[in-house]
Amino acid sequence: MSGKIPGRAILLPVSLVAAFLFIGVGTVLIGGRAGEILFDHPSKHFPYPLTFQNVMHVVFFIGLGELFARWRSGLQEEGHIGQRYLPEDEQTVLTARDLGPIRIRVAKAHSREHGFLPSLIDLSILQFLSSKSVDQTAAVMNSSLELIAHRVDLRYGIVRFIAWLVPTLGFIGTVYGLGASLSEAGNSTGDLNIKEVAKTLGVGFDCTMVALAQSAILVFLMQLIQEKEETAVNLAGDYTLRNLINRLYQG
């Protein structure tokens, strides 16, 4: 199984440092048109590095940090499947006397937030020991599985918000850039340089292009990682059903 999953108190500063490093190194190494697209450097409307693109980079890296935590969680949950918490042969039948040692082991392997499989096994064993009913145990397991799936979905709320926020910032940056360029052209007292105005307007659209690319990356990674976590939930339910619920003997 994977190690401890970093919390937001660790992820946020690490994500900010990574974003600042990306901006700093990119500013030094990437120049010309690519530098204008990615960083709006040199900027005509903002004191560098306080540009819309750089703000989007910071938000983007925060989203990547959240996804990293979810990816680590998915790896950890998948790792529980191979721990052989339950007998996996075709002959073993479990009675109430057999469940004590199993529960002692799984109780140490889960917490409130992590450990879908040991949590399901622990809860199912407790229900069976208290009710002596396989049907009630199966019903409790199904209810717990639905709650876990809902909890997994809720964990992606911030990532979904960031995937929405990034293109929103891009659109705002583009509108601001277009407005500022047109305002400067309108307030010009000399001859209007059409070429310079067109170049400035083009830079305004770069903000949206970068934002849409970042949003697409976040959504793509979110789909892959959420699928990994949801697969772990389904595998935990299937494992518990096959190797615990279907082996329970009420006699």
Protein language model regions, located:
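Membrane-interfacial helix-loop-helix connectors in multipass membrane proteins
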Residues: G35-H45, L182-G202
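Perimembrane helix-loop junctions in membrane proteins
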Residues: L67-I81, S181-S188, Q223-E230
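Channel- or pocket-lining gating/hinge segments that regulate access to a cavity or pore
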Residues: A138, G157, T189-G251
